[in-house]
Amino acid sequence: DAPYGYIARTNFSFAGEVNNGAGYVRYMQEDKILMPASATKQITPSWIFKELARSFTNSLLGIDLKSGDFNRPKTSGWFVDQDFIARKSTSCSVVVQGVKVGENAELTTMWTVLGYPPASVVVPVWVKGASEQLPALLARNAGTKLSPLCDRAVTLRDRAFSYTQGMGSERYFNWELIFNKAGKG
């Protein structure tokens, strides 16, 4: 059921214990972005990947890393990964785009980002033919046993999350490597 035209989920259960689990701040940010976008019919797969899957806004803290206020020379360019929709442990982002009434259901498209979404690209996959052949970028490589696209995205993510000194250091990331005003993130 999607009374507002969309269904948003993070990683907590609506059926489980209230206030138990993670993802509440991320869910609130998703809903804050989706509600007006739904009302103005802005939601497209491209919009979802740009505005949600690659969001670096924490509404509880009132910050948006993409504002430019967290880049050099204003800061060091490093930040703590805390309750952004995109986070280090995110393994993929998927949008399923259905078909209109009367269209062939085999044309349903699964827009897929494998690996860390800010470091990956979107690849479409269709129901028709999916069982025979996935794009080579998405499919598991027989030699490495990894998806080439996911492997590359994880490598790029690890460059950004490269600080390893001390307990909790895995949460620090070089924001400048992901987003900067020069457009070279």
Question: Where do the protein language model's features map onto the residues?
Answer:
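C-terminus-biased signal that marks the final domain/tail of proteins
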Residues: 1-185
